[in-house]
Amino acid sequence: MFKSLVRKSSAFQPLKYGGKYTVTLIPGDGIGRETSNAVTEIFKTANVPIEFEEIDVTGMEKNNKSSGDALHEAIQSLKRNKVGLKGILFTPFEKGGHTSFNVALRKELDIYASLVLIKNIPGFKTRHDNVDFAIIRENTEGEYSGLEHQSVPGVVESLKIITEYKSKRIAQFAFDFALQNGRKSVTCIHKANIMKLADGLFRRTFYDVANGYDAITPKDLIVDNASMQAVSRPQQFDVLVMPNLYGSILSNIGSALVGGPGVIPGANFGRDYALFEPGCRHVGLSITGRGEANPTAAILSACLMLRHLGLKDYADLINAATYSVIEEGKTLTKDLGGSASTGDFTHAILERMESL
């Protein structure tokens, strides 16, 4: 179950011509091109009323002016279209490398809320059953503020920024999501026992916001305890809200519970824009070009996008076909224990759509 939260903004008006929505497509680096191709092929076969405006952004080229220009073009495209679908862009480790293009997109457009859905796929056996929770992560501050400097040789200071305004905004998003999607509780994940000012502010603001939502139970957990609880008893979780870094870590832990990063959908929301991408944000460089990529995360993220645009019937068809192929177990990619290629898996979904 998923209901978008951006439509309540009067500023959000997706671009639509001739009965079709125009959506920005950023294939991404690594396996992004392969998984994006799977989505576009499925959309074409299903006659989904979407026209993609493709912008080829890459983070692979160090300090390349054309990469920066492409990023700017992508931002302008998203400002026009209001909705985007993207793969993950590579971020270099080296000091001289560019900052994360993924983070830059979210900050420039103030796409402040990340949503990752952690849920068992019917018929696909994992260690835990009945896992179904949402991770909501603040996208624009915390440890991802990008404010670092070397004060003296051998000493680096990295600033973690937490503000009351953005803490309140993400908490409201989490409670609104819970309310609109039939969830019962929202848990604040923090480290306020150590970071008493920063995470203390985040936790305190969370409980202030909770006072306005009588139907939802507020809880909180220290992040290390939450990580342990996630792998031991994930069924207790419903909606989790947290600063940026904790969200990155728990999203990856969550993915391992239900099949890995290849099956986790994600979305990012701001007041005016929505950007959909795989929930675990893995580039997959080690398997690029080998035809082994699992496109499920990209496909399910695209289904979230369709629901966001009000195209529920198309989303239901594609979602059902994807789940059906996985449940059948005959055509699975390598990460799910099979030997099918990305193309084989995609074509199995296309065939299943015809029979549904």
From Swiss-Prot:
The keyword Magnesium applies. Keywords: Magnesium, Manganese, Metal-binding, Mitochondrion, NAD, Oxidoreductase, RNA-binding, Transit peptide, Tricarboxylic acid cycle. One of its GO terms (biological process) is isocitrate metabolic process. Binds 1 Mg(2+) or Mn(2+) ion per subunit. It comes from the Eukaryota. It catalyses: D-threo-isocitrate + NAD(+) = 2-oxoglutarate + CO2 + NADH. InterPro entries: IsoCit/isopropylmalate_DH_CS (IPR019818), Isocitrate_DH_NAD (IPR004434), IsoPropMal-DH-like_dom (IPR024084). One of its GO terms (cellular component) is mitochondrion. Its main location: mitochondrion. Substrate binds at R106, R137, D224. Mg(2+) binds at D224. The record marks Y144, K191 as: Critical for catalysis. One of its GO terms (molecular function) is NAD binding. Its cofactor is Mg(2+); Mn(2+). The keyword Metal-binding applies. Its EC number is 1.1.1.41. Belongs to the isocitrate and isopropylmalate dehydrogenases family. NCBIfam families: mito_nad_idh. Performs an essential role in the oxidative function of the citric acid cycle. Also binds RNA; specifically to the 5'-untranslated leaders of mitochondrial mRNAs. Octamer of two non-identical subunits IDH1 and IDH2. This is Isocitrate dehydrogenase [NAD] subunit 1, mitochondrial. It comes from Schizosaccharomyces pombe (strain 972 / ATCC 24843).
